Amino acid sequence: MESRTEPALPPPGWIESSGRRLACRRRAGRGPTILFLPGYMSDMEGGKATALDAWAAAEGRAMLRFDYGGCGASPGDFEAQTLADWRDDTLAAIDSVEGPVLLVGSSMGGWVMLLAALARPRRVAGLVGIAAAPDFTDWGFSEEEKEKLRRDGRIAEPSPYGDQPYVTTHDFWKSGESLSLLNAQIEIDCPVRLLHGQRDDDVPWSLSLDLAEKLRSADVQVVLVKGGDHRLSREEDVGLLIATVTQLLERL
């Protein structure tokens, strides 16, 4: 039986911007460059990001993965970060490559990709959201939790995805509240694809329908995965993600 060779990892590198150093892995290839945006408390070595990178290697596509400040291999205190910081990190990543980019945002990364597309409309050619979670600092917290954030400055809860507690600071929450999007039309005109599992216990799939309505773009599609959970990390889910990225790149 012929063995299958795994694609070589791009060497680790750095994006430098405004005194921040962001760990990254760049893969050369034809554009638009795929830029993966992780979710909260995640990093560029997650399963969807690495699977997409392996596909990009096989197809000769350009891809950039990176870690927000304070996450993964990027230096910084996680609890000192805000949503605005991670938006700016994403803009620095966009500015570090040439030509158009296709943003792929998972969960909170879906919120960040929208903010980045608003800030760089001429650079962002398309968006793919995976359980995109804009405005989660509003709908994702009870009034009691919001009051605790104001009073204590942070909350820490058990995470279903790992041993580390799920920590939110008041500064992050306040930053998110200042960057809310769903209360008005979102002035994004590029093609958008939104994937969402109907068994998502963290972000209701109806949010992707609401987001589709708010986007100004006429080219928006929502795909609901009946058995999919929040992560959409099963083999068939990753296959759907890759197919979606492939089809969108062919249109750009």
List where the protein language model places each region.
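Short beta-strand element of the alpha/beta-hydrolase
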Residues: 31-39
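The serine-hydrolase catalytic nucleophile loop
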Residues: 40-53, 206
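Catalytic nucleophile-loop/oxyanion-hole region of alpha/beta-hydrolase
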Residues: 71-97
